[in-house]
Every structure is written in C-alpha cells, then in structure tokens.
Regions:
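Structural signature of hydrophobic alpha-helical transmembrane segments
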Residues: 44-58, 101-111, 177-180
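Cytoplasmic-side transmembrane-helix entry/capping segments in multi-pass membrane proteins
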Residues: 73-84, 101-109, 131-139
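Short, hydrophobic transmembrane alpha-helix segments
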Residues: 38-51, 65-73, 94-95
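N-terminal membrane topogenic signal
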Residues: 14-30
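Pore domain of cation channels
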Residues: 174-231
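Outer-pore turret/helix-boundary of cation channels
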Residues: 43-46, 56, 147-181
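Pore-domain transmembrane helices of cation channels
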Residues: 115-161
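Membrane-embedded alpha-helical segments in integral membrane proteins
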Residues: 11, 30-44, 60-63, 85-93
Length: 232
C-alpha cells in the first residue's frame, strides 16, 4: 500500500513536471497571470470572495514554479518558500491573533524572484524561438508587475504609508487592487498620476519598476530576435 502510494505520488510529480517544463505551460501561466493581474482586482472590488481567490491564485502560480525546473537546488528553494508562504497565509486566515503580514509578503517577493529566474531559464533554453517563448516573455513582464505589488504591500505594512492621491488604503489584502494598478502604471512608464508615491522607498520602487519596464522588453526582444536570426 505504501509503495503504491509512493509510486502514484512519483508519477504525479513527473506528470506535473513534464507539463510545466513543456512550452505549452507558458499559455497556462499567462492565463493565470492575466487573471491575477487584470481580472482579480475587479472581482476583489465587487465581491467578498476576491481576497480568497487572490490568495489561491497567487499560491497556485508559485506552486507551479516547483515543477518548472529540473535543477534540484531551485526545486528545493521553490518548495521551501512555497511551504513557508502557505503556512503564513494559513496562520493569518486561521482563528488566531497571529499575523506575519510583512514576512509573508517578503517571502512572496523572494518566491516571485525565484520564479522569474526559472522562467527566464525556460525562455532561453535550447535556443529555440516560437510563439510560446514570446508568451513566456510576457509572463515574466507580468510577474515583475506582481512582484512590484507585493513590494508595495511590504512598504505599506512596514512604514504605514506608500501611495497618495485618489486612493484609500486599508492595510489589508484589498489594497492589492491599488498596488497592482500603480505597479503596472510604473512598469509600463504610463504613470497616470491619479495615484502617486508618497515616501522615498515607494518613489524608488516606482522608478526601479519603470527602469525594468523600459529595459526588459528591449533586452529580451533583442535576445529573442538574435536567437531567431541566428537559427535562420
């Protein structure tokens, strides 16, 4: 019985790994990220279940990271970070007075960084360029926006201030709506100006995101075009 369970578990891990290592997984991740970045904020504003959905989706994205690499070291780091993240979320949503909101989001940022690194590795492996790889580049861009939103949550939780202007922040998960909006506006260098950075750390984060937003497409597109032309 134990051997049977172990065999089934190993098979499940192999199946998940073969899916997340394949190019087709880029599309699945894109759908998950579009939901997390563009659709969820709308759901969070109109429904009480939005926060739970957001947490489930965020954890699902990071969970997929465990299976998106063959490197044992990266699998271990992803799995450990995911486990800590999940535990801290469960503690916060459980019936107890404990909450590690800042630590939780710091772990979330570390998780996002590892996942971005894993995705960049997937993107440039075996020097092939196809539609899926372009989708993969979009995924990394959206992951940067997500990371920016988590960083804003940390700044706000640690300092009590982050964004000013046409915005009311509650200090809870609901603030994600404003943070992802500001993060995307900074990353795309649009900067609508209705919401703006108040303290220095938020200002530096906004300019850092803008710098990434300008450099990332230039570097990644140049690399993909270079690979495509060298193959032809």
């Amino acid at each position: 019985g134990v051997n049977c369970a172990r065999y089934a578990m190993r098979n499940l891990v192999r199946t998940l790994q073969s899916f997340w290592l394949a190019d087709a997984s880029f599309v699945t991740l894109l759908i998950m990220l579009i939901a997390a970045v563009f659709v969820l904020p709308v759901i969070m504003e109109i429904s009480g279940h939005g926060v739970l959905l957001f947490n489930i989706l965020l954890l699902s994205v990071f969970f997929s990271g465990i299976f998106s690499t063959r490197s044992v070291g990266l699998i271990a780091v992803s799995a450990i970070l995911f486990s800590i993240h999940l535990t801290l979320r469960l503690i916060r949503f459980g019936d107890n007075p404990y909450s590690f909101f800042v630590l939780e989001n710091v772990i979330g940022i570390a998780n996002a960084l590892v996942f971005i690194f894993i995705n960049l590795q997937l993107l440039f492996r075996d020097r092939i360029v196809n539609t899926y790889r372009i989708v993969g580049a979009v995924n990394v861009y959206l992951l940067l926006a997500l990371m920016g939103a988590l960083a804003l949550e940390v700044i706000h939780a640690a300092t009590g201030v982050s964004l000013g202007g046409n915005v009311v922040l509650s200090g809870k998960d609901d603030d994600y709506v404003h943070f992802i909006y500001f993060s995307l506006a900074s990353l795309t260098t649009v900067g609508f100006g209705d919401i703006y950075a108040v303290n220095t750390s938020t200002k530096m984060l906004a300019t850092f995101l803008s710098t990434l937003g300008v450099l990332f497409p230039a570097i990644v597109i140049a690399r993909l075009v270079g690979l495509a032309s060298s193959r032809s």
